[in-house]
Amino acid sequence: MELDNFFLAEYDPRNIDHKTVIIKLENADRKDKNLGDLEYHIEKINKRREYNRCNHAYISYYDDIPIGFISIYTENDSYQISYGIIQERRQEYLGALLLQEFSEKMYEVYPEIGNLTLTIKPNNEASRKLAKLVGFERQNTVKYTQRRM
């Protein structure tokens, strides 16, 4: 899937670049556990796709280099986004740019989506700031939503 500044490849566990991104994200996240078990998360997404076409896990490429993970999935009648940028590419505003472009693309591709949701742990200050920067509004201590324009 093409975005303005990124290319998204559907996650393939046989692709070494894809596996490397997931391993880097899980290793960087061991302390805070913001992303959780990504392999399990991806399995759940693939199972949910059988019932709803809006369930996908992607590896994001920037300048042809894999820099992160982003997914859309349905949970409790809402459309959730989960994302992560590998440690060595953080602090470059790639997360904000990726989230903004991905959100716009999801509204374009899936007209049934009325709003998107992020679940962000209270201790994840960087993601909370990023969500607000991209136009997500805080609903409670962990939930942020963005409505279709």
Could you tell me what each predicted segment is?
Residues 3-6, 133, 137-149:
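C-terminal "cap" of GNAT-fold acetyltransferases
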Residues 16, 76, 125-126:
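Short alpha-helical
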Residues 91-106, 129-133:
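Conserved acetyl-CoA-binding loop-helix of GNAT-fold acetyltransferases
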Residues 28-82, 88:
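Acetyl-CoA-dependent GNAT
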Residues 1-27, 149:
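Conserved N-terminal entry element of GNAT/NAT acetyltransferase domains
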